[in-house]
Amino acid sequence: MVRPFFTSQPREAASIEREEFYLELILQINSFINGIVWGPIMLFLLVGTGVYLTVRCGCLQARKFGFMLRSTLGSLFRKTDKASGGQNLTPFQAVSTALAGTVGTGNIAGVTGAIFAGGPGAVFWMWVSAFFGMMTKYAEIVLAVKYRQVDGDGTHFGGPMYYIEKGTGHKWLAVLFALLGGVACFGIGNIAQSTEIAGAMQSLVGLPPLYTGILLAILTAFVVIGGVKRIGQVASYLVPFMAIFYIVAGVAVILLRITDVPAVLASIFTEAFSFRAVGGGVFGYAILVAMRQGFARGVFSNEAGLGSAPMAHAASNTKEPVEQGLWGIFEVFVDTIIICTLTSMAVLLSGVLENDINSYGSNGAAAAAAFNAIQIGRAHV
């Protein structure tokens, strides 16, 4: 409940009480909005769309998985045309740009938070979300490339706001998406990322958050002032190194606790469908919490259905929408099935769940503690 503040207190005390009042009010508003945005209805709509597309496309993500790998990873070893003119990107630069926005906080802090809130079972529902999310992102990218625009110098640009207007004819809906998408960029794309980075840096090396923020702003400025072409070039070098480094580190951590892996995998599946005793009765509340956390963090991580990735893919120089759409399936597979799973295994193998999440300061710090605990041999299950 929101506590009132009293002006009869000394000025300094009243100021502190006022700050606490507004902070608590903001937290309550945020919690209310969060309950709607990441509530059951919205999450089932997102996942339900993926289910619908999976059925209509004949389970393309599984049926053509090998073809997808040959068309994406395989294309990196074949001679292809470079981006032609303007600020266009190669297909790989486009997917690297999209992955740069998805691989990050959601894979580490988001997954850790989901496990703390929903238990090991949240990992299973995260996998389910990713499987159907592959088709959602595939469809987003196909539409973005099909309905993209070309300016005077041959530069491609597009995204959901363009295919919403041209595909449905409802311009107001496209404008609404653009406005809400701009707002979401601050919360999902900037604040969440920088906050977790700052929290982890402060926890690990004692660097004040202000200095971390300044450093991030400077590094980001050097990239974005070069336009979409510079972003694509930087992402094409940074993302593969970042992903490979994390995958190697994650695999190494798992190998250190390889004997405990079967038990952890078993807990993921059993907890996904477990009925716990609550208040003397047995309810499926634990399953609902695990599903919500798994679905929410899966979507937050791979951004399937959010509309951000199609903007990067629309700038690709590819001429075939379906070909670029396969990169969307690849994105979700790498982001969630591989990287998020590695984070999940590290957290579950480390024993950090025995402590309260608040004792670590942030989800990112808890994930770092998990990796550190295993590496120095102090973990126990």
What are the functions of these language-model segments?
Residues 19-101, 105, 115-122, 133:
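N-terminal alpha-helical transmembrane segments of multi-pass membrane transport
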Residues 45-52, 56-69, 196-201, 208-216, ...:
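Membrane-interface loop-to-helix entry segments
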Residues 53, 129-154, 160-223:
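Helix-loop-helix module between adjacent transmembrane segments
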Residues 59-89, 113-115, 119-120, 127, ...:
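Flexible loop linkers connecting adjacent transmembrane helices
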Residues 80-116, 143-161, 165-167, 179-182, ...:
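Alpha-helical membrane segments and immediately flanking helix-loop junctions
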Residues 132-140, 214-228, 239-259, 292, ...:
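Selective recognition of specific alpha-helical transmembrane segments in multi-pass small-molecule
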Residues 138-148, 152, 249-267, 275, ...:
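Extracellular/periplasmic helix-exit of transmembrane alpha-helices
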Residues 379-381:
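Conserved small/polar residues in nucleotide/adenosyl-binding loops
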